[in-house]
Amino acid sequence: MNRRKFLYNCTALGIGSMALPSLRSAYIPGTVPMGIVVHSYANRWQSKAKSQKYPGFSNAIHLMEHCHQIGAGGIQVVVRDWTADFANKLRDKREKLGLYLEGSIAVPETQADVPKFEQEVINSKEAGANILRTVTSKGRRYEIFHSAEDVARFKKNALASLRLAEPVLRKQKVKLAIENHKDWRADELVTALKQLQSEWIGVTLDFGNSIALLEDPMEVVEKLVPYVFTTHVKNMGVEEYRDGFLLSEVPLGNGFLNMQQIVTLCKQHNSAVTFNLEMITRDPLEIPCLKNDYWASFNGVPGIELARTIRMVKANKYRSALPRLSHRSIEDRLEVEENNILECLKYSKEELGLK
């Protein structure tokens, strides 16, 4: 039995956490190459730019064809207004190319939304998706919530939506994976999952988002990984600015997160977990954690977590200035986007065993 087979079998038997020489050498290889989240192509998805080299993707089939060409294992793409005919065509394309498919879907806000939600779940399933990623907020916590009451209302409404969705998921046997989308802190999301107690609702584990909420990225992984269905793979760059710090997705080999350790933990907890690249090519996000307005939605979060985060930013300052793209031409942005994705795919195969 070779080493790869041995490590994979250890995971399947539930003994993947046994002592091994090092996390870098003991990562558990994936069974398929890393997939691509549609947001990795934020500049190219449904783009109207007249680029000969980087034409826009008008639908999921076009995205899937391209991702197959560059060596990805699958895609995670928005499910919205798919017809039964389109779902069938996407299924045929997926089966021909041998890729996996995951959807990204909105949960129902009211009972009146449930029929549409169920139809989208059915169409997703028909196309071959049995995992659907979702978010339960309209934006980033520190931008859209301005009081503890706002946060409490968000949690209440999110739980109500998920309870509307759960019977549909159970009936259709499709899993829903909630992303830590700069809205839920890890403990809050775990509490919600425990309240729901459904085998059909789990987590889309985003490797870097929760840094924006002053959380230690490895602590977030350790708290959420028992519930992981799918992932948003990314590495992060940080640097200080006047009101806090800047946060940016960077190519997987260039950031400060321990990618091998995170992948290993995910595989230990769910041997069928999928790894989907979310390499968003854009200007850095401003995390204004030194401004009073930022703290309006963080009732009860101790100052020590701010201090820890600032220390982390200082210790892991990006090797040069974080990339800025907004001043560049659309053709340049498309080129950088594609090169970033190709670099990440190469890293995932060579360093993470996702091949």
Where are these predicted regions, by residue range?
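Active-site mouth loops of central-metabolism enzymes
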Residues: 40-58, 104-114, 149-153
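N-terminal twin-arginine translocation
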Residues: 1-5, 16-28
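Active-site acidic/histidine proton-transfer and metal-coordination neighborhood
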Residues: 16-22, 82, 97-101, 108-202
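Histidine-acidic metal/acid-base catalytic patches
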Residues: 4-11, 27-35, 40-52, 60-65, ...
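Hydrophobic faces of well-ordered beta-strands that scaffold small-molecule active sites
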Residues: 32-39, 75-77, 101-105, 132-134, ...
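Acidic-and-aromatic substrate-binding clefts and catalytic sites of carbohydrate-active enzymes
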Residues: 76-87, 107-115, 142, 180-187, ...
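Acidic (Asp/Glu)-rich catalytic clusters
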Residues: 27-30, 64-69, 83-102, 116-129, ...
